[in-house]
Amino acid sequence: MKYDFTTRVNRKGQGSFKWEDMYAKKPNVADGIVPLSVADMEFKNAPEIIEGLKNYLDQVVLGYTMANKEYKKAVCNWMKKRHNFEIQEDWIINTAGVVPAFFSAIQEFTKEGDGVIIMTPVYYPFFNAINLQGRKLIDCPLIEKDGMYYIDYDLFDKLSQVSENKVLLFCSPHNPVGRV
């Protein structure tokens, strides 16, 4: 597949959160600046993706769907094949997305006032998921050395010994530093 990865697409006015947020905060931002705040495309869709979606849409009726047995089996197979980790189908809980998933996890496994450990810098919705639910944000900053980030295992061990700290909200691959 040959594709143009050099042409920038300005998504201003298209409802893109990161673009609209950038212009709201800095209305006079210079041309050529690209907001890299979220994992969102900066290039036109590849022709193969457009064609694949058109073919799919020709065959289906859009509506609400649910995860069926085949879906859950595929997830289990993926985890085994890609990560050598066996999971059970009943462990799989579907959510409306990753952000609602970790909001729900914090609500399920902690109570107000409990500590939730994060490793900063980290995906910005982690902060809201903790603070908006009345939990205490416990920072275990990553160590930056020669342009790479590393977990501070000594600090993490210390923080995990505190009985009020109930959950580690872990991002892997880590956003924004990219480490797995």
Question: What residue ranges belong to the model's regions?
Answer:
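A short helix-loop-beta submotif of the ANL/AMP-binding
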Residues: 132-137
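Generic structural signal for small/hydrophobic residues in well-ordered secondary structure
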Residues: 36, 53, 75, 92, ...
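N-terminal small-domain helix-loop-helix segment of the aminotransferase-like
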Residues: 2-97
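Short beta->alpha connector loops at strand-helix junctions that form conserved
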Residues: 120, 139-144
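Active-site phosphate-binding strand-loop segment of PLP-dependent enzymes
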Residues: 142-180
